[in-house]
Curated annotation (Swiss-Prot):
Domain of life: Eukaryota
Compartments reported by the entry: Mitochondrion
Organism: Arabidopsis thaliana (Mouse-ear cress)
Example of a GO cellular component annotation carried by this entry: mitochondrion
Protein name: Uncharacterized mitochondrial protein AtMg01000
Keyword terms, alphabetized: Mitochondrion
Length: 114
């Protein structure tokens, strides 16, 4: 399960999804699973719980803006805009010593974007 496409397929099967992902759109699930599956580390479940624990209002706002603005323009544009906003907030949060790395903060956007 190292390909982002796996996350997309999981997203298309809502009955498979448990916990904080219940009711989320396939696009949100793809962003979360697709991003985390490329990195070694904790399991997907614990990773998502960790991100929820360290969520921030800035991250939620950035995710909502990028999600609503970019989605109509297609996946390629969405990736570009999403990660641009993500990197900006990740650097700000790191200065405030939130305790998350870039990947956790980036994917955290989409937990609250729908």
């Amino acid at each position: 399960m190292t390909q982002p496409a796996i996350g997309w397929r999981v997203g298309l099967g809502p009955s498979i999804i448990r916990g904080p992902l219940v009711g989320k759109s396939p696009w949100s699930v793809f962003m979360i699973y697709g991003r985390t599956s490329k990195k070694p580390g904790p399991s997907r479940t614990s990773f998502l719980v960790y991100k929820r624990k360290y969520s921030s209002r800035k991250a939620a706002l950035g995710g909502t803006l990028s999600h609503k603005v970019c989605k109509p323009f297609g996946m390629g544009f969405c990736f570009f805009l999403y990660f641009s906003i993500c990197r900006f907030f990740a650097s700000k949060e790191r200065e405030n010593k939130v305790g998350c790395n870039d990947v956790r903060i980036c994917t955290n956007f989409y937990l609250f974007s729908d």
